[in-house]
């Protein structure tokens, strides 16, 4: 559509475009154009309707939308972290969880029968409500557990969330799940289908798409609901058990679950789970399991946490649904390491609320083990409730004349020979210049969680590789603005090609230049070595000052680092000594890449050799204290033993204080800890 079209034609085009982009955000939670392009479309539509009132209508997007529903929400740090849960998938694993609770409390397994509160695990969006002196200050999504996004305006129309709690003093965090009920989801999609609008994929996507935008009216139209079930900070709240928390929330006017139950022992918890599994089809909302929590709050505190989850709670997942469908084709994807991964292209089938059309087949051995043929009817489930996976073949429905699938001997992208080494499970493209490997490797290198090079998106990377300007990430550092400015960024509002332009090209070159001094863990992770994610990269970067130091480390050196292990260490050493990797590292160095040492190396090891346990209520959150101690070389444990150097104890310290007294472990309050930090030359608590 051009600007020279008639006003009526232009109005029709603008109306269609704005409505399309609204749908992509509201229904799909997936905007496809930048904010400024969207704003330009809306602005032009409004101006056109102002000049031609006859075009305006109550249903026009110009009359019904406000500002662009932005994905850039204000970030907020949760006063206490929102942790994940470990999973159980059988009664035996639930019994094992019961044993682990006992061990976390320094008790022999089976020596005590614990009381648990059992609740349904709702498949929605986690929310944290923060109150000060009884007044709601903000609501935020879970985010990464430490930092979430404020969505306060969007939750205010959801029933069961009071904005004031009379008589309450201090800080309070109330946590729960925002969801869309099955009935609301079905009604929404029925209406959307009648109106020719895209359907929601599942209730959770419907809730997420409504909650994460800045038009509260749209949220209200979605009919979201909430169930609250937990407290973070809880100044002045008179509760001693998880069951007390649920009753207190209900008394304050919060929406709570009618399906919660307090039980005695893990067998009773398993019976609750079996009952909920049977009721699952009749539940008014999607749920993917039950949550079993140690009821006594003091025992929860004593049991403590692992690095990612509480030791006193577990999510017992419902059995995965299994569906039958047909493998219509098997395609091959080449990854950034060159590995060829087979994918089953399935006849679309509904599975656990979503349509499944693809499933990974892992490798050649997996296909051979199932004796898969194209055209086979197969049984499919979601592994862990998330990843579609082929379980087996329905042999009686195999088409006559079908033959076993032959795994390719050449890369589907570049045509180069693909090799499977003896003893290896994977088949790999051997072409170092394979475009698929180059593109994915550079995209991985530039991604936010690795080198964090802003502005280097998928489309630009593909063009740089296709043009021969970039073969691997080291080539990025030779790019100039002149080489980048004429590449494509996307389409204009009129359907033309939008180029990068000189200004954006210069910004990108500056971003690439700035990445030369990224933290060591980022540069190390960017190498794409087997099993080296953020956690492993961070742990190793805390020990060594440079990439060269890591290259000189032996398998034994690396294996001694906590949570690295020998298998990972062997993979790292082998990868770093590979001839191609050595040449690549030399090119990075020649390009001027000089990683900044990670924080632990720079500050030294003032607390090295000391083991701390932190318990009780302190003015500084316990997780902040633990992180601070760990940054300066200390080991932080969840239980008191003879090897504990110090117990940091606040109010209501509980059984850990008793254990420390029994074992004659030194006990420090906050003032004592600050004094110790000063004596050791470490900075004070933040």
Curated annotation (Swiss-Prot):
Q: What is its EC number?
A: 6.5.1.2
**Where along the chain is NAD(+) bound?**
35-39, 84-85, 119, 142, 177, 293, 317
Q: Which residues form the active site?
A: 121
Q: Which GO terms describe its molecular function?
A: DNA binding; DNA ligase (NAD+) activity; metal ion binding
> Could you tell me which CDD domains the record lists for this protein?
LIGANc
Per UniProt, the keywords (alphabetical) are: DNA damage, DNA repair, DNA replication, Ligase, Magnesium, Manganese, Metal-binding, NAD, Plasmid, Zinc
The BRCT domain is annotated at 602-686
The Swiss-Prot or TrEMBL record describes its family as follows:
Belongs to the NAD-dependent DNA ligase family. LigA subfamily.
What is the name of the protein in this document?
A: DNA ligase 1
């Amino acid at each position: 559509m051009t600007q020279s079209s008639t006003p009526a034609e232009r109005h029709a085009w603008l109306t269609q475009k704005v409505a399309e982009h609204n749908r992509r955000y509201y229904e799909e939670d997936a905007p496809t154009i930048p904010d400024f392009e969207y704003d330009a479309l809306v602005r032009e539509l409004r101006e056109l309707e102002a000049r031609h009132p006859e075009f305006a209508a109550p249903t026009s997007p110009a009359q019904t939308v406000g500002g662009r529903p932005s994905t850039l929400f204000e970030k907020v740090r949760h006063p206490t972290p929102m942790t994940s849960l470990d999973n159980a998938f059988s009664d035996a694993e639930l019994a094992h969880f019961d044993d682990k609770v006992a061990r976390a409390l320094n008790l022999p397994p089976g020596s005590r029968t614990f009381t648990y509160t059992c609740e349904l695990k709702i498949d929605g969006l986690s929310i944290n409500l923060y109150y000060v002196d009884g007044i709601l200050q903000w609501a935020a999504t879970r985010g990464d557990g430490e930092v979430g996004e404020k969505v306060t305006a969007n939750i205010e129309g959801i029933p069961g969330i009071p904005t004031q709690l009379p008589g309450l003093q201090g800080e309070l965090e109330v946590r729960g799940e925002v969801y869309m009920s099955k009935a609301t989801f079905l009604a929404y999609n029925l209406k959307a289908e009648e109106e020719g609008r895209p359907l929601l994929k599942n209730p959770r996507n419907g809730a997420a798409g409504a909650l994460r935008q800045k038009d509260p009216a749209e949220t209200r139209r979605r009919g979201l609901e909430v169930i609250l079930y937990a407290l973070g900070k809880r100044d002045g709240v008179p509760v001693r058990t998880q069951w007390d928390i649920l009753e207190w929330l209900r008394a304050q006017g919060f929406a709570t679950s009618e399906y919660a139950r307090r039980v005695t022992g893990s067998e009773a918890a398993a019976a609750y789970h079996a009952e909920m599994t049977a009721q699952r089809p009749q539940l008014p909302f999607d749920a993917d399991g039950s949550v079993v929590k140690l009821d006594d709050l003091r025992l929860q505190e004593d049991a403590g946490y692992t690095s990612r989850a509480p030791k006193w709670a577990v999510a017992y997942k419902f059995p995965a649904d299994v569906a039958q469908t047909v493998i219509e084709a098997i395609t091959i994807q080449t990854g950034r390491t060159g590995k060829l991964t087979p994918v089953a292209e399935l006849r679309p089938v509904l599975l656990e609320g979503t349509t499944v059309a693809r499933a990974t087949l892992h490798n050649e051995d997996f296909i051979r083990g199932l004796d898969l043929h194209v055209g086979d009817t197969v049984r499919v489930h979601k592994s862990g409730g998330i990843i579609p996976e082929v379980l087996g073949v329905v042999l009686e429905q195999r088409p006559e004349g079908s033959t076993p699938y032959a795994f390719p001997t050449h890369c589907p992208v570049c045509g180069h020979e693909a090799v499977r080494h003896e003893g290896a499970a994977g088949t790999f493209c051997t072409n170092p210049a394979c475009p698929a490997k180059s593109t994915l490797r550079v995209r991985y290198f530039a991604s936010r969680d690795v080198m964090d090079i802003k502005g280097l998106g998928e489309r630009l990377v593909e063009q740089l590789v296709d043009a021969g300007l970039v073969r691997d990430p080291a080539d990025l550092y030779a790019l100039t603005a002149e080489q980048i400015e004429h590449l494509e960024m996307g389409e204009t509002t009129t359907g033309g090609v939008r180029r990068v332009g000189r200004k954006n090209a210069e910004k990108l070159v500056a971003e690439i230049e700035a990445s030369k001094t990224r933290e060591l863990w980022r540069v190390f992770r960017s190498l794409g070595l087997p099993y080296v994610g953020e956690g492993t990269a961070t742990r190793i970067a805390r020990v060594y000052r440079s990439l060269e130091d890591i290259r000189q480390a032996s398998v034994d050196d690396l294996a001694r680092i906590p949570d690295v292990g020998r298998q990972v260490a062997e993979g790292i050493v082998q990868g770093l000594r590979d001839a191609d990797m050595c040449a690549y590292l030399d090119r990075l160095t020649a390009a001027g890449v000089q990683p900044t040492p990670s924080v632990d190396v720079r500050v030294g090891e003032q607390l090295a050799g000391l083991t701390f346990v932190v318990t009780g209520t302190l003015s500084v959150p316990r997780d902040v204290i633990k992180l601070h101690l760990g940054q300066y070389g200390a080991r932080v444990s969840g239980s008191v033993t003879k090897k504990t150097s110090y117990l940091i104890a606040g109010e209501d310290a509980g059984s850990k204080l008793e254990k420390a007294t029994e074992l004659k472990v030194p006990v420090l309050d906050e003032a004592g800890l600050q004094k110790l930090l000063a004596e050791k030359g470490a900075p004070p608590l933040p």
